[in-house]
Curated annotation (Swiss-Prot):
<comment type="similarity">
    <text>Belongs to the thiolase-like superfamily. FabH family.</text>
</comment>
<dbReference type="GO" id="GO:0005737">
    <property type="term" value="C:cytoplasm"/>
</dbReference>
<keyword id="KW-0275">Fatty acid biosynthesis</keyword>
<comment type="pathway">
    <text>Lipid metabolism; fatty acid biosynthesis.</text>
</comment>
<dbReference type="Pfam" id="PF08541">
    <property type="entry name" value="ACP_syn_III_C"/>
</dbReference>
<dbReference type="GO" id="GO:0033818">
    <property type="term" value="F:beta-ketoacyl-acyl-carrier-protein synthase III activity"/>
</dbReference>
<protein>
    <recommendedName>
        <fullName>Beta-ketoacyl-[acyl-carrier-protein] synthase III</fullName>
        <ecNumber>2.3.1.180</ecNumber>
    </recommendedName>
</protein>
<dbReference type="InterPro" id="IPR016039">
    <property type="entry name" value="Thiolase-like"/>
</dbReference>
<dbReference type="GO" id="GO:0006633">
    <property type="term" value="P:fatty acid biosynthetic process"/>
</dbReference>
<dbReference type="GO" id="GO:0004315">
    <property type="term" value="F:3-oxoacyl-[acyl-carrier-protein] synthase activity"/>
</dbReference>
<keyword id="KW-0443">Lipid metabolism</keyword>
<keyword id="KW-0276">Fatty acid metabolism</keyword>
<dbReference type="InterPro" id="IPR013751">
    <property type="entry name" value="ACP_syn_III_N"/>
</dbReference>
<comment type="subunit">
    <text>Homodimer.</text>
</comment>
<keyword id="KW-0963">Cytoplasm</keyword>
<feature type="active site">
    <location>
        <position position="280"/>
    </location>
</feature>
<feature type="active site">
    <location>
        <position position="112"/>
    </location>
</feature>
Length: 325
């Protein structure tokens, strides 16, 4: 059988760091208010780099660190809800910049679950035997869709990108078990870049494009539905929660992680966290955490670590993949 394997991980964030104190100068908030409610201290905000710029820097790191000829890459998937444009896709822009001339490339839109959904897709492409090598990236420039006068959302988000290189060199299944979910009926709880039909044949008013969020509804969704998803995936894997080495969850809010750990009966230190430095980077949050963990020696990519990856956010979407890293 053919098994996919993650062989490289990389991340990139803009150099510009915006602290809670910086935000207090442009809106009615302060460090204590933000940190006590979210666990966030800083976020990296682009001063000109767009989503494809961040994603390209990640892809170049993956290629350079692996020594792989970019022409041998079969596909590039970019998970994002903040693309440079609808056409061409962010992935197509990345493909051009790195010289992956033989790769097909497309964007996947699943908000904060995007990286997990994209990794699931990539694993199937490789394990089917149809493709040998691919790149999966989560990349966001949320600063361009934020209403910077709205402290309820502006304090939460940051910009960044991260990703992995996969190939067919695995000796065991990459994904042990997975469960992906969507509930479009609750999609209105988290909206971004909403555009009405505007043509000479329709009389519909424009409703704006800034991100809007029903904070309480999203928090309740995260602490109610997501632990059930993780537990269901664990049951499919025949693994107990304590047998997982690390939990890499979407970095939305530290209080959400506290509640997740308690509901699953897992010690909080297994839930890795870096939101204090990056904020919520949507589709980029899980791969940034993964890449940083490898860089800092928390775990390596030797296939010996069992990790839960769980995303949850707009759509509403949520999903878990238990993987062998």
């Amino acid at each position: 059988m053919t098994f996919a394997k993650i062989t490289q991980a990389a991340h990139y964030v803009p150099e510009n760091v915006v602290s809670n104190d910086d935000l207090s100068k442009i809106m009615d908030t302060n460090d204590e208010w933000i940190y006590s409610r979210t666990g966030i201290k800083n976020r990296h905000i682009s001063t000109g780099e767009n989503t494809s710029d961040l994603a390209t820097k990640v892809a170049k790191q993956l290629i350079e660190n692996s020594g792989v000829d970019p022409e041998l890459i079969d596909f590039i998937i970019v998970a994002t809800v903040t693309p440079d444009s609808m056409m061409p896709s962010t992935a197509a822009r990345v493909q051009a910049q790195v010289g992956a001339t033989n790769a097909f490339a497309y964007d996947l839109t699943a908000a904060c679950s995007g990286f997990v959904f994209a990794l699931s897709t990539a694993e199937k492409l490789i394990s089917s035997g149809a493709y040998q090598r691919g790149i999966v990236i989560g990349a966001e420039v949320f600063s361009k869709v934020i209403d910077w006068s709205d402290r309820s959302t502006a304090v939460l988000f940051g910009d960044g990108a991260a990703g992995v290189l996969l190939d067919n060199s695995g000796s065991q299944p990459l994904i042990i078990a997975e469960k992906m979910q969507t509930d479009g009926k609750r999609g209105g709880s988290l909206l971004s870049s909403y555009a009405d039909i505007q043509t000479p044949f329709a009389s519909v008013s424009y409703e704006g494009s800034n991100l809007s969020m029903e904070g309480r509804a999203i928090f309740d969704f995260a602490v109610r539905d997501v632990p059930k998803n993780i537990q269901a995936t664990l049951e499919k894997s025949d693994l107990a929660a304590e047998e997982i080495d690390y939990y890499l969850l979407h970095q939305a809010n530290s209080r959400i992680l506290d509640k997740m750990a308690k509901k699953l009966g897992v010690t909080r230190d297994k839930f890795l966290q870096n939101m204090q430095e990056y904020g919520n980077t949507s589709a980029a949050s899980i791969p940034i955490l993964l890449s940083e963990s490898v860089k800092n020696g928390i775990f390596s990519l030797d296939g010996q670590t069992k990790v839960v990856l769980t995303g949850f956010g707009g759509g509403l979407t949520w999903g878990t993949a238990i993987i062998n890293l």
